[in-house]
Swiss-Prot record:
Gene: CYLC2
Ranges annotated as biased composition (Basic and acidic residues): 103-159, 166-217, 238-267, 276-342
Source taxonomy: Eukaryota, Metazoa, Chordata, Craniata, Vertebrata
Organism: Homo sapiens (Human)
Record PANTHER family: CYCLICIN, CYLICIN-2
Residue ranges, annotated region (Disordered): 35-59, 101-348
Name under which the protein is recorded: Cylicin-2
GO molecular function: structural constituent of cytoskeleton
Length: 348
């Protein structure tokens, strides 16, 4: 056997050397050729299963990105490199010597403890202050409510006092009115006294006037006689005027009665005229009814005639059809009889 040869196969940027013998090379070439260019199946022969067909010949898919030279780095590598570049090296942090403890640190720690205690105290004070403020607020609210109640009571008391003052003022007004009435009554009494004094004076005057009145009464009697005569004349004139007015009224009444009679006659005539057209309307209605009855009878007669004509025509058509059918039947029967007779004659 010959020495194994090295076959160079290119897979992207890497070079892999695979040792392949000549026999294996020949067999591989034959199988590869048979797969690429299979022989046509001969008639009458069964196809043998080849080992290359039994095996799972999956072709490896080569990515184009892998074949290219510019392969991207994985994400984890990229991230780690970026972190290293940003962050200082761990060795520097490890080699750094720890600082010596100084007094300032102790002082700072004490100050911090004191500050914490002070903060705790301030927080406690704040809480107590807030609680006290809440309590004070509640108390103030209660006080405010009490103050409001007191104000309302004061307002009610003021209202009551105002009402009392108003009532007192009304009482005073009524008292003043009564006093005014008393004063008015006194004034009336004084006026009455003055009137009585005047009456006495008038009585004395009337006594003085009586002598003058007697003279006037004599003159008045004469005047009364003259007035009576004039009154009689006036009564006579009035009686004449009344007679004239009564005559005029009677004349007017007569004219009015005549006019009323004329109007009544005209109204009666109008009613008669109205009754006449109503009678004519009734006559016209009767005529219309008679005409409608006549038309109805005429229409009924026409319809009956049409029906009878149709029935007669149908009966005639049926009779003709039946006659034709009977004639045909008779002709057929006669033809059959003649045929039978002819057949009998021929048989003899």
């Amino acid at each position: 056997m010959s020495l194994p040869r090295f076959q160079r196969v290119n897979f992207g940027p890497y070079d892999n050397y695979i040792p392949v013998s000549e026999l294996s090379k020949k067999s591989w070439n034959q199988q590869h050729f048979a797969l690429l260019f299979p022989k046509p199946q001969r008639p009458g022969t069964k196809r043998r299963s080849k080992p290359s067909q039994i095996r799972d010949n999956t072709v490896s898919i080569i990515d184009e990105e892998q074949l290219r030279g510019d392969r991207r780095q994985p994400l984890w590598m990229y991230r780690s490199l970026m972190r290293i570049s940003e962050r200082p090296s761990v060795y520097l942090a490890a080699r750094r010597q720890p600082l010596k403890p100084t007094r300032t640190v102790e002082v700072d720690s004490k100050a911090a403890e004191i500050g914490k205690k002070g903060e705790d105290k301030t927080t406690q004070k704040d809480t107590t202050d807030s609680e006290s403020e809440l309590k004070q607020g509640k108390k103030d609210s209660k006080k405010g409510k009490d103050i409001e109640k007191g104000k309302e009571e004061k307002l009610d008391a003021k209202k009551d006092s105002k009402k009392g003052k108003k009532d007192a003022e009304k009482g005073k007004d009524s008292a003043t009115e009564s006093e005014d009435e008393k004063g008015g009554a006194k004034k009336d009494n004084k006026k009455d006294k003055k009137d009585s004094n005047k009456g006495k004076d008038s009585a004395t005057e009337s006594e003085g006037e009586k002598g003058g009145t007697e003279k006037d009464s004599k003159k008045g009697k004469k005047d009364s006689k003259k007035g009576k005569d004039s009154a009689i004349e006036l009564q006579a004139v009035k009686a004449d005027e009344k007679k004239d007015e009564d005559g005029k009224k009677d004349a007017n009444k007569g004219d009015e009665s005549k006019d009323a009679k004329k109007d009544a006659k005209e109204i009666k005539k109008g009613k008669k005229d109205k009754k006449k057209p109503s009678s004519t309307d009734s006559d016209s209605k009767d005529d219309v009814k008679k005409e409608s009855k006549k038309d109805a009878t005429k229409d009924a007669k026409k319809v009956a005639k049409k029906d009878t004509e149709k029935e007669s025509a149908d009966s005639k058509k049926d009779a003709k059809k039946n006659a034709k059918k009977d004639a045909k039947k008779d002709a057929k029967k006669n033809a059959k009889k003649d045929e039978k007779k002819d057949a009998k004659k021929k048989g003899k």
